[in-house]
Regions:
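Short amphipathic helix-loop junctions that connect adjacent transmembrane helices
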Residues: 36-60, 270-288
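Juxtamembrane intracellular "pre-TM" segments in multi-pass secondary transporters
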Residues: 4-12, 220-254
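Hydrophobic core of transmembrane alpha-helices in multi-pass small-molecule transporters
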Residues: 121-136
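Pair of pore-lining "gating" transmembrane helices in MFS-fold secondary transporters
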Residues: 13-45, 251-267
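Transmembrane alpha-helices of Major Facilitator/SLC transporters
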Residues: 292-307
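Conserved small/polar residues in nucleotide/adenosyl-binding loops
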Residues: 308-313
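C-terminal ends and interior cores of transmembrane alpha-helices
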Residues: 103-117
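Glycine-rich segments within core transmembrane alpha-helices of 12-TM secondary carriers
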Residues: 159-176
């Protein structure tokens, strides 16, 4: 893949553009797989004839299964993120870790094409790896923001990244909606095949468009060798951060509150679509598919409008 040590100065348009472009690349995962199409495929087609499955000699309800697997994935992320962040800070090379999660997540999205009830164990492994890849890459992606921008640019660049993510994900979801509704025109025999292809497209989109970001984002300290005790050094970096946090009770309370709020919110967002598929009477399966996807599309469009109509910090200061 393309790679180079960036020559772009901090705050440059090229560097900022490369950073925001990754939002365009990876946001299709959160919309197409987490929110829109995969929940329909999982509830409406994978578990069309049954509400439970046998895994390791245990009968598990389909809703309990996906909720538990998603929660388990977030626990892994909660453990790995601070440790890997400490390792990245120690080595001074965020890009290599970001690449690892991007490749793992995008390739796992390709694996979701073969998500079937008969192979539910390996299918769920792809689901977990895709979710970890998505959130793991965001740890390093977000940490780049203060490296490539000046403080006065941070809010504007962050908002631009969100906007790019919304526009990119909505664009692909529209393509997928057309492909699913008119599957015969695209050579598919059923909606199911069109849905499965949409998962693979997400993987290709994510992996392909992220290369532009990798090409221009700073690589870090090229000459730093990775020591044998790098894991221990990662824990040492965490210990330093922990001491800083413990020095302020207010900061500690804020982080605990944010942790509970953030993970609770993410859990609700991930399960909301499965609730919509199971509990809302949409009519026929095709009407259910179109209705849920269009509903999520409208939510995304509202978010885009809010991003472009909300006052900037500069406007607020003037008022």
């Amino acid at each position: 893949m393309f790679n180079k040590k960036t020559d772009h100065p901090r705050g440059s348009k090229k560097l900022i553009g490369a950073w925001t472009w990754y939002d365009w690349a990876n946001s299709v995962y959160s919309l197409v797989i987490s929110s829109a199409i995969f929940p329909i495929y999982y509830s409406q087609y994978i578990f069309a004839q049954t509400n439970s499955v046998i895994i390791f000699n245990l009968e598990i309800n389909k809703d309990t299964l996906i909720s538990s697997v998603s929660g388990f994935s977030f626990l892994i992320i909660a453990f790995l993120s601070p440790l890997l962040s400490g390792i990245a800070d120690y080595t001074g090379n965020k890009k290599i870790f970001m690449k690892f999660f991007v490749y793992m997540g995008s390739i796992s999205c390709l694996g979701l094409y073969w998500f079937e009830l008969e192979t539910i164990e390996i299918s769920l492994v792809f689901y977990v790896l895709a979710l970890i890849g998505y959130w793991g890459s965001l740890v390093y992606y977000n940490s780049y923001l203060t490296d490539i921008t000046y403080p006065k640019q941070t809010n504007m660049v962050s908002a631009r990244g969100f906007a790019m993510g919304y526009i990119g994900s909505v664009s692909l979801l529209l393509v997928n909606l057309i492909m699913i509704n008119y599957y015969e025109s695209f050579g598919f025999t059923s909606e199911i095949n069109a849905m499965k292809l949409s998962f693979a497209i997400v993987g290709v989109w994510w992996l392909g468009f992220s290369q532009y970001s990798f090409y221009h984002l700073p690589k870090g300290n090229k000459g730093v060798k990775i020591p044998k005790n790098i894991i221990w050094n990662g824990f040492r970096e965490l210990k330093k951060v922990y001491k800083v946090i413990r020095s302020s009770k207010r900061f500690t309370r804020f982080l605990l509150a944010f942790f509970v709020f953030s993970f609770s919110l993410q859990t609700v967002l991930y399960i909301a679509s499965y609730f919509g598929v199971s509990e809302i009477e949409w009519g026929s399966p095709s009407e259910q598919t179109s209705g849920l996807i269009i509903s999520i599309l409208l939510i995304q469009l509202v978010a885009i409008c809010l991003l472009y109509t909300s006052p900037s910090p500069r406007d607020l200061r003037k008022s």
